[in-house]
From Swiss-Prot:
Presence of keyword Zinc-finger: no
CDD domains: cupin_7S_vicilin-like_C, cupin_7S_vicilin-like_N
Family indicated by similarity: Belongs to the 7S seed storage protein family.
Species name: Macadamia integrifolia (Macadamia nut)
Record domain Cupin type-1: where: 271-410, 455-625
Biased composition (Basic and acidic residues): 239-251
Name assigned to this protein: Vicilin-like antimicrobial peptides 2-2
Function: Antimicrobial peptides 2b, 2c and 2d have antibacterial and antifungal activity against a range of species.
A GO term from the CC aspect: extracellular region
Keyword Secreted tagged: yes
Stored Pfam families: Cupin_1, Vicilin_N
Region listing for Disordered, in residue ranges: 161-191, 221-251
GO MF annotation list: IgE binding; nutrient reservoir activity
Encoding gene (name): AMP2-2
Amino acid sequence: MAINTSNLCSLLFLLSLFLLSTTVSLAESEFDRQEYEECKRQCMQLETSGQMRRCVSQCDKRFEEDIDWSKYDNQDDPQTDCQQCQRRCRQQESGPRQQQYCQRRCKEICEEEEEYNRQRDPQQQYEQCQERCQRHETEPRHMQTCQQRCERRYEKEKRKQQKRYEEQQREDEEKYEERMKEEDNKRDPQQREYEDCRRRCEQQEPRQQYQCQRRCREQQRQHGRGGDLINPQRGGSGRYEEGEEKQSDNPYYFDERSLSTRFRTEEGHISVLENFYGRSKLLRALKNYRLVLLEANPNAFVLPTHLDADAILLVTGGRGALKMIHRDNRESYNLECGDVIRIPAGTTFYLINRDNNERLHIAKFLQTISTPGQYKEFFPAGGQNPEPYLSTFSKEILEAALNTQAERLRGVLGQQREGVIISASQEQIRELTRDDSESRRWHIRRGGESSRGPYNLFNKRPLYSNKYGQAYEVKPEDYRQLQDMDVSVFIANITQGSMMGPFFNTRSTKVVVVASGEADVEMACPHLSGRHGGRRGGKRHEEEEDVHYEQVKARLSKREAIVVPVGHPVVFVSSGNENLLLFAFGINAQNNHENFLAGRERNVLQQIEPQAMELAFAAPRKEVEELFNSQDESIFFPGPRQHQQQSSRSTKQQQPLVSILDFVGF
């Protein structure tokens, strides 16, 4: 068989290249040493001793530069670099000069590792590592190896820091859950039993859930728990306590567990209330709104951000400062309790607690724009949480946009690792709030023609006031910044044991939150009356429904809320051991009025003609007039407990105020 000579030569050549490539890595170190010895032999042939010394020095330098230092670099654990380097020097470098040079380089690696470990911040570690590479390495190949080692260490430290941050977050969440469980355990055991029963019902099929929940409610009623509106601690089958069972399935009531933590650090937290429309379709009027609560420690700084939603801020406690960026203009305002200010969507803003002792409390009412009931924050600065939005862009884009180098980007972006709310020194706080004194505060003026600054509710006369309470409100017609959102802001201070109402809003639906104290709330609701009302003759026409109002009850503590829909009569009672402080945000606020159903003044029922009242109530005119004219106060009244005490001391018999509700068939 004939063999093509050229093909055979090609095959032999390729085979020789393959054998050479497989042996070169094994013989690399030996080849380097032979080359080094050959270099020195050639030096010995030179004529003068000076030339010989310079030649040998060049051989030494050439050999040192050819050492592959990547084999002494541990990619996974920098802590072992030092130990492995020394061990490999002893094993792989045979010549005394090479041993000496190798050991010297290992010593540098060890010192580098000690200095690296002393510095806790990964970014500073990285920068110092890069400086050492530039200081000690002159050969490009060695410089690249050193820089790659810096990169690997930096990435590993970032992963470790992120892991520590996530562990801290989990620990904080676990503590929060434990606290909520402790609060649950403090409640009445029978109430917990009822809630457990309802949770078991939720696991059943939909058609079985209703009957199951009815059994839970019936079982709860049969326990016959004590207490009533006048004295919740009293035994017996009082009216008020039996209403607590309704609180758990009350679509208008939001307890503290309805607040989810958006951000939490050692310096404060930001919580957002459950989506209104997600809770119940009865709250569809609020589907574009969210409520956010912020608490910040003294001398705390809240990172700059902007929202994809319009926001109204109400300061409910403490003293702060607000910075807003409108295009290329910065506005600065000192904030005090009672201040109201609007932040338009897309406006970058940041907050400072300028008080040394008191926490800053702010409520934010958001009107969403992009997705109904959903909003997002956008932070230009941050680290792991929040992540800065600038870090989303590619390195090339940022270098071009900011006209800078990658090293400077790395030194700035992503370095804030303490979270959204961080601590600032008093000197930093003074510097941040220095120009706030130059910003004029809101001057109360009808229509708000002159300023975008804050409006303070307490700088105007109370809307309603007597010895039982005070109420303050700012409406869109008072403050121009509220007109676009058509939102009002309301604050009421009800003295201990007193009450406000009953009353209803003519146009506005309000979200009412307890800032301090405790509140007992009763509200008449026609939408939950299906369990009691019915359709006559089985007819399905809406106009033939029986009219019935469900009595909605709730007991509110601090940070808990209730929604009062438009037209729903409602009463707030200060039931705790201190005054009750409420604040509220109302939508559809323009031309809204509170219509009161009791009291000497502003009582709409008193304006009805006596003959009409007699016909409507089917009772003698005198009895009707005495009933609705017996209250000497207006808006705020003595509460049920105070009224009972006054009645027991008085020789004149008075009809209890709560009987008004019974009188109208509540």
